[in-house]
Amino acid sequence: MSSTQGATKIPAEASSAAVRHMRRWEGVAVLVATLACWSSVPLFVRHLAEYIDHWTNNGWRYGASALFWLPAVLWALGRGALPRSIWRAALVPAVANTLAQVAFTSAHSYVNPALLTFGLRLQLVAVALGAYLLFPSERETIRSARYLCGLGLLVAGIAGVLLGGGNLGEGSNALGIALAIAAGMGYGVYGLAVRRFMYGFHPVYAFGVIALYTGSALVVAMLAFGRGHGAEVLELGSRELWYLGLSAFLGIAVGHVLYYTAIDRMGVAVTAGVLQLQPFVVGSMAAVLLGETLSAGQWLGGMVAVAGAALVLSAQKAAERRRARATALEEAEAAGESSAR
């Protein structure tokens, strides 16, 4: 995760010793579990959209998630492991996360969850634009032919998914598409904000603080705008209550723990690459469980979009390898000059 300059860093060995002893098959299992958790959330939220409004959905799910993360934050505070600067650093990421979450959840009332999750790939466009402006060291990568080709395929593919349903003229569908785009771009801004402001903080503590801010904001929004000020959830049947609880537990609480563990064990590139399969998993399950399907043209557009995303990720990975080789060469030359003296 990312941060303000001068933030207190948590040594890697303090956070990932157990992960480093994890077998590769265990790392793969964690990554698959992450994909399963995050693929289940759009299905739960889409089902619940028939029973509660999105303000109530967000307030209860993120409120419960904030309570889940609260003990970790309090434990870190008690040990003196939580720098005071983290509270200010987390404000911008939390605002971006809150707005993106509102768009994400409300979109489920209007569009197929598979269409929405394909639309979320647009976060890579927001990340590219933001990284070009904020991180000069990445401009060469973003200007590369592979990266730009990937972005082009991504945008073209997502346009095929969003516009290929044949009913864009319907107001509700147009609103859903706009919300899907807003959610994708919003999560991209959130990722940039995390990288810019949260660098150096332990990822679990960083997300814990962001979850507290986001949960508090969404609970306040629920009380202000939700039907019955959020009390509508008390009218849900036992099955829908289970779905609401599972969507919070699997998607926000456990899902993020698994995600960070997968990154630590399998690496960012592998983790991000596997998670590009999410729209296909969601689309398949939505067809089976909800009877909601995409057209053949939309599936084709989705495949083009994911291929573009994979090309972008491969360009980033190639740039990381080049930087690592350059750093190793500089260190070797410095060591040689030192020994010559």
Model-derived features with residue positions:
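Membrane-interface helix-cap regions at the ends of transmembrane helices
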Residues: 43, 47, 51, 65-83, ...
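Specific alpha-helical transmembrane segments that line the substrate/conduction pathway
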Residues: 56-67, 105-142, 183, 268-287
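C-terminal-most transmembrane helix of multi-pass membrane proteins
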Residues: 2-13, 20, 62, 137-138, ...
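Hydrophobic transmembrane alpha-helices of multi-pass small-molecule transport proteins
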Residues: 69, 91, 128-132, 143-165, ...
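Glycine-/small-residue-enriched transmembrane alpha-helix faces in small-molecule transporters
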Residues: 2-59, 92-95, 99-106, 151-152, ...
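Hydrophobic alpha-helical transmembrane segments of multi-pass integral membrane proteins
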Residues: 25-33, 55-72, 88, 126, ...
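Specific transmembrane alpha-helical segments of multi-pass solute transporters/efflux pumps
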Residues: 37, 42, 73-120, 155, ...
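A helix-boundary/kink motif common to multi-pass secondary transporters
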Residues: 53-54, 112, 202-203, 267-268, ...
